[in-house]
Amino acid sequence: MSKRMVSLFLSAVMFVVCSFGATATYAAENIESAIIDGKEYRCESRIVDDKEYMYITNITDEITDVVYYDVCSGIIFLNGKPVAYVENAVSFPDEKSIESVSPLATTGWRYHDTSNHRISWARGVAAATLAGIIAAVIPSTGWLSVLTKIGATALSAVSAACIGGNVKCVAYTQVLASGKVQCRYDWTFRPSSGESYGPYSSYKL
């Protein structure tokens, strides 16, 4: 299982944390590719000094953007400069809602929590970069998944039209026959321009 740029959920507990560990060696974690407006893009997740970075490369034009989400400060950096800010709000189930089942899932799923992430970005950022910013706040969801589900055309329009939006993520869990806990995340992206994209689903063991 590959690490993501930011781990907002740990196992079935799934709490946002600030981690401080020993210096890690450079490692390539995951590589995804896509064609956007006739240009080839590659997204590579790397770990440098225990921090996860997303390298988004426009191979056609030989341009690379580096995205890093600092979980503790809530700031997303693009090429070393703050380009987006994340405000997180997490709600946990009460006695009535704890039995809720995901509308996108079969029976057996139990509601865990709902998180809302208000994100902002610099107007006109590339669609590929905006996909990376959105993916940064969704557990177990890669850059390519966001790009393909929302669509490059829609992301380009959103980037040009506004500078902020909301990412809502509803988490569910179920216990498999093996005894392992599987997590499901149903997420929706709503830019301030009014459109709604989703819900889409991602999974994690």
Question: For the regions a protein language model found, what residue spans apply to each?
Answer:
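Transmembrane alpha-helical hairpins and terminal membrane-anchor modules
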Residues: K149-N166
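Membrane-interfacial hairpin junctions
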Residues: I138-L147
